[in-house]
């Protein structure tokens, strides 16, 4: 299975919705698309919706951590939302939720960043 990447900008927030599998085959594509958007759009924060992501490996964690560091460097924040149980377990084991905020829904994530959805 491949990775579907849907991105749009709401005010200064890049909303990323992933579907399918984020692994060593697809991680570089996500990295490039997000980096391009951060460079061309006026992005301050990232909301990462993982509701329809069925699988993720350590390559996916690495890409997410890298984008987290990128957005933190400009004083922004990353919020993960609507995560599937299997992927949530990976986040819990890796300790990423100690540094990246989690919200139940994309709407709630946007509200925490000061954007009305």
UniProtKB/Swiss-Prot annotation:
Posttranslational mods: Phosphorylated by SpoIIAB on a serine residue.
PROSITE patterns per UniProt: STAS
Keyword Phosphoprotein carried by entry: yes
Modified residues (Phosphoserine): 58
Domain STAS: 3-113
A GO molecular function held by the record: antisigma factor binding
InterPro entries for the chain: Anti-sigma_ant, Anti-sigma_F_ant, STAS_dom, STAS_dom_sf
Disulfide bond annotation, renumbered to this chain: none
GO BP, sorted A to Z: sporulation resulting in formation of a cellular spore
Keyword match Transcription: no
Keyword annotations of the record: Phosphoprotein, Sporulation
Function: In the phosphorylated form it could act as an anti-anti-sigma factor that counteracts SpoIIAB and thus releases sigma f from inhibition.
Family statement: Belongs to the anti-sigma-factor antagonist family.
Stated name of the protein: Anti-sigma F factor antagonist
Gene: spoIIAA
